Amino acid sequence: KPGGIVTINSCSHAQLRSGFWFYHLIPDAIERICERTCDPAAMASLLKAAGFGETKHAVDPDIVMQDASYFRAEGVLDADWRSGDSIWALAAPDELETALGKARELAETGELQSFMKQHDAPRSEVGQLTFSSAQKI
């Protein structure tokens, strides 16, 4: 209806590639999720074609989708922890096995926390979530 506002929260491709530290363990799954996710620019085009005005995008880099558990590096080795993010379902069995092997190796050498911090650093710039809103014309 004219004047109505739609708000959509989603992850941009940049956020999917750089906003989640553990995604770096499953690079093929990142590409699969990007294929299934509408980037904000494409979303704006679709909304415009559907009769909406200019789409505005907002990112709050302080939002962490998994709250404090996101920063528990060894959580990646726990199936319950992994069930908190659907990207793991897109990892092929061999990719998951490789990822868990790498995470175990990093944990055993005391480097898992460092891996997490290194790969989490871009999140402060790109965030994890984009809020897109547009008004129906």
Placement of each model-derived feature along the sequence:
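Active-site capping/gating segments
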Residues: 31-53
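Helix-to-beta-strand junctions that scaffold the AdoMet/dcAdoMet cofactor pocket
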Residues: 1-2
